[in-house]
């Protein structure tokens, strides 16, 4: 029985390592994330920059159907800013007007992020038959998601290694399983302007947009950590009280 358990543990460890590294190829580099650890929190400035990158670059192909404009409050935007951001988009109202016709209106904070395509078929047609994944939960979709996506965004090589070839329309990526993918490098130095003086580099872009995507995948992380800490403190205090009660009871017995 012990040998079986040992084998199972080794197998699970190997599988976990494979997922964490993204499959074959070199290990995914670990980044220094503000949200790491028991007391980690999201960096709101980085999330706002990441949202800017999503709007200006990623949103042309990728939807985020599970995120609503009102959720941007967590990034530090106030109510007026959120209304202005939402109003930049138009949506088809879910209910017809008095004449029975569907109509377009400015988006509201209660609306979900606007998808770049009307439906999946339109998305596939515009992307050579491939459906761009929704990014709402992309970080949670695989182990080591934040580091993996950062590696994916920064792992493109202009030329494949010696002896390797890529077909027309494909690109070589160091950290993508199989290394060959159809998505062109989405980010490059100087592509998106930052107003706060943050370096406009590929590495910084990747760090910021992944900070935003990590929040989108796990928006309640900070609350969960805070609640967990309070529970631990309560349990420690409760244990101390119970220990005192026990000592008092047994002292009377003796």
Give residue ranges: language-model regions:
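Positively charged n-region of N-terminal signal peptides that target proteins for export
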Residues: 1-4
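Bacterial N-terminal signal peptides
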Residues: 7-16
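Boundary at the C-terminal end of the N-terminal hydrophobic targeting segment
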Residues: 17-22
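Electrostatic cytochrome c docking/interface patches
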Residues: 27-52, 63-82, 197, 217-224
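The canonical Cys-X-X-Cys-His
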Residues: 54-65, 209
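Membrane-proximal low-complexity regions enriched in glycine and acidic/polar residues
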Residues: 92-180
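Extended, hydrophilic extramembrane loops/domains of integral membrane proteins
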Residues: 176-177, 181-218
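Juxtamembrane interface at the cytosolic side of transmembrane helices
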Residues: 224-227, 233-254
